[in-house]
A protein has these predicted regions:
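Periplasmic c-type cytochrome electron-transfer domains
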Residues: 2-61, 130-141, 164-165, 171
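A general structural signal marking secondary-structure boundaries and capping sites
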Residues: 5, 81, 120, 146-149
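A generic secondary-structure boundary signal that marks alpha-helix termini
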Residues: 10, 39, 75, 121, ...
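Residue-level signal for alpha-helical context at structural boundaries
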Residues: 19, 84, 92-95, 130, ...
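Sequence/structural segment immediately N-terminal to covalent heme-attachment motifs in c-type
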Residues: 60-83, 96, 111-112, 117-118, ...
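Flexible coil segments in periplasmic/lumen-exposed cytochrome c-class electron-transfer proteins
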Residues: 71, 103-109, 124-179
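Histidine/lysine/aspartate-rich catalytic loop segments that bind and position anionic ligands
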Residues: 79-105
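Conserved beta-strand positions that form and line the central face of beta-propeller blades
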Residues: 98, 122-125
Length: 179
C-alpha cells in the first residue's frame, strides 16, 4: 500500500489522449455532500428568514416517525409532552424552555429545524444523528404537541363536534361505558 502506481492531481499523463491525469466528472455527477439544492428542505429557511411552512406535506407517517424520533432524541430533556422537564433535567441538567410558551408556539417550523440541526444554548446539534426528513418529522411532532395543549373548539372539525353533541351522557340509573 505504501508504494502504489497513481497519478497526482493535475499531473501530466501520457496514458490519456488529453495528457491530463485528472479526469473530468461524469455528466450529472453530484459532489459528495453537495446535493443540498433545496434550501428550504436542508436549512429550514426561505432567504434569510426561518421558513413558516414545511417543505413537504405532513402525513400521518411523517408524524409517527417524528414521534418516534422525538421520544429518542428530544424527550430526555424536553419530556414526552414538551414541558421541558425530562429525566435528564430531573437529574440536574439545565431545563430547556417548554414548547408551549408563546415565543415557541409562535416560532416558525424552520426555527425548530435549525435548532435541531445546529443546536441552541446547551442543546447539542443533531445534524449527524438525525437525517433531514426525520428532523422535519420531529418539527411536525413538536407542532402537534403545541396544538394538543392549546387547541380551541374552532380547531375541532364540525363532524367531530356533532358526534360529541349527540353522544348520550349517563343519566340517573345509567352506567357509563367502561370501554
Amino acid at each position: 500500500m505504501q508504494d502504489q502506481p497513481k497519478y497526482k492531481a493535475f499531473a501530466p499523463s501520457p496514458f490519456f489522449d488529453d495528457g491530463r491525469a485528472s479526469r473530468p466528472a461524469v455528466p450529472h455527477t453530484v459532489a459528495r455532500g453537495h446535493l443540498d439544492d433545496d434550501t428550504l428542505l436542508y436549512t429550514g429557511k426561505v432567504g434569510d428568514a426561518f421558513a413558516p411552512l414545511f417543505p413537504a406535506p405532513v402525513t400521518s407517517q411523517v408524524l409517527a416517525r417524528g414521534h418516534e424520533r422525538y421520544d429518542i432524541y428530544c424527550s430526555p430533556c424536553h419530556d414526552r409532552v414538551g414541558t421541558g422537564n425530562g429525566m435528564v433535567v430531573q437529574r440536574g441538567y439545565r431545563r430547556p424552555p417548554a414548547f408551549h410558551i408563546d415565543r415557541l408556539r409562535n416560532a416558525a417550523p424552520g426555527y425548530f429545524f435549525d435548532v435541531v440541526t445546529h443546536g441552541f444554548g446547551v442543546m447539542p446539534n443533531y445534524a449527524a444523528q438525525i437525517p433531514v426528513p426525520d428532523r422535519w418529522g420531529i418539527v411536525a411532532y413538536i407542532r402537534a404537541l403545541q396544538l394538543s395543549q392549546h387547541a380551541t373548539l374552532a380547531d375541532v372539525p364540525a363532524a367531530e363536534i356533532q358526534k360529541l353533541m349527540t353522544r348520550p351522557t349517563p343519566g340517573a340509573g345509567q352506567k357509563a361505558d367502561s370501554k
